[in-house]
Amino acid sequence: MLYDYLIDVYGINEPILLSTIKYEDMSEGSIRQQIKKLTDAGILKRYDTGIYFIPKESVFKAGTSLPFYRVIEEKYLKESGNRCGYFSGVAVANELGLTTQVPMICEITSNKATNDYREVMLANNKVIIRRPKVLVNNENYRILQFLDLMKDIDHYSEVKGEVLKDRLTAYMEKHIIKFENLEKYLYYYPDKIYRNMYQAGLLKGVPE
């Protein structure tokens, strides 16, 4: 049964992208019909166009929903289980403890972007999608994410000096990012990134 397949492949309370469902010899049209039947029966819940999930049991009448950022990750940042994008903007600065700002708009960079800049709506939330400077993969997504942050660090960061340097280097050490990893991608960024890295104390302080 299709339901058993969905449980095995996607699990409970995880995003199910209609476009990724491949079940036996069932056609796309038949899959859509079966998904609609499961949704009408309350076995599946619709999150947004083409996105469903198997809800877990809940004591609340409204039931459960999916974490927004989890949906973003599956829809835009992964392709066949591999990385094809990353979060960017204020969310990354907040993750590193560089700002107390909470992002009102989700910003991502993805190989799936069809334009350099595009705005879409997902579950009534605005998402900004940018095309990457080079193709994103499992090996470079953290590096490109870090360089995107450094390009605009002067705009995002509320901390400076040693605090800024310590938080940046801690992140680099955590994800094993060395200057030699950054160097081959610097060509794709504007010259201001060198100034930002210097002012953050990274040109001489990047872990070797």
Specify the residue positions occupied by each region the protein language model found.
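Hydrophobic alpha-helical interaction segments
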Residues: 132-208
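Short beta-edge/loop segments at beta->alpha junctions of small alpha/beta modules
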Residues: 1-76
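Alpha-helix N-cap/helix-initiation sites
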Residues: 24, 28, 45-46, 85-86, ...
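Short gly/ser-rich loop at a beta-strand->alpha-helix junction or flexible surface loop bordering the NTP-binding
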Residues: 47-51, 78-116, 121
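Short coil/loop linkers at secondary-structure junctions
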Residues: 27, 98-99, 190, 203
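Amphipathic alpha-helical interface surfaces
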Residues: 31, 88-89, 142
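A short, charged helix-loop
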Residues: 122-131
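Short, surface-exposed loop/turn motifs that are enriched in glycine and acidic residues
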Residues: 62, 78-82, 136
